[in-house]
Regions:
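Rossmann-like dinucleotide-binding cores of NAD(P)H-dependent redox enzymes
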Residues: 20-67
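A structured beta-alpha segment of the ubiquitous adenosine-cofactor-binding alpha/beta core
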Residues: 62-108
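Rossmann-like NAD(P)H-binding beta-loop-alpha module
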Residues: 1-28
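FAD-site-proximal beta/loop scaffold in flavoenzymes
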Residues: 1-4, 88-162
Length: 184
């Protein structure tokens, strides 16, 4: 229960947006969202971020948790400031900790809403020709959901990245129609 508490959510995706907005609805005293990149590089829906801001969520951009503060319970976080460096293998600018830049944030509850890096999908599926996006998800035709390999289709998180289950359900229905057409 977030009521009357200082909430800090770590992450920048749709799950983080669900957490911050739920905390607001539960009447949290304050809600902060820490993200290691800037707003333009946040993976979550821009609409969700805008809605969260309108509802009173404070975004702490270019920040990364360093350590939890508290005795027998969390009382806050020590946070490092981040600067964006050169692009990494995915093409996104790599977050780099700024030396001696830490600051503290008060928190009664800390929620980690962090995603995971995708695996090397071409290697995992034994097909080095399988195309992926700069995010590491499978690249598909927008209309048919077919990959660059004829007869190989994909749907859900493997093409979107971590997302909501309703999108996976929609994708599953759409790709079933495409597969049926392909087989006929």
């Amino acid at each position: 229960n977030a009521e009357g508490k200082n909430i800090v959510v770590i992450g920048g995706g749709d799950t983080a947006m669900d957490c911050v907005r739920t905390s607001i609805r539960q009447k949290a005293k304050s809600v902060k969202c820490l993200y290691r990149r800037d707003k333009e590089n946040m993976p979550g829906s821009a609409r969700e971020v805008a809605n969260a801001e309108e509802e009173g969520v404070e975004f702490v951009w270019l920040s990364s948790p360093k350590e939890f503060i508290g005795i027998n319970k969390v009382e806050g976080l020590m946070v490092d400031k981040i600067k964006l460096g050169e692009p990494d293998d995915s093409g996104r600018r790599k977050p780099e900790i700024q030396n001696n830049s830490h600051f503290n944030i008060k928190a009664d509850i800390v929620i980690k809403a962090l995603g995971f890096d995708p695996e090397n999908l071409p290697k995992l599926f034994g097909s080095e020709d399988l195309q992926v996006t700069k995010w590491g998800t499978l690249k598909t035709d927008f209309d048919t959901m077919e990959t660059n390999l004829p007869g190989v289709f994909a749907a859900g998180d493997i093409i979107r990245g971590a997302s909501l289950v309703v999108w996976a359900i929609k994708d599953g229905r759409d790709v079933a129609i495409s597969i049926k057409s392909f087989l006929e």
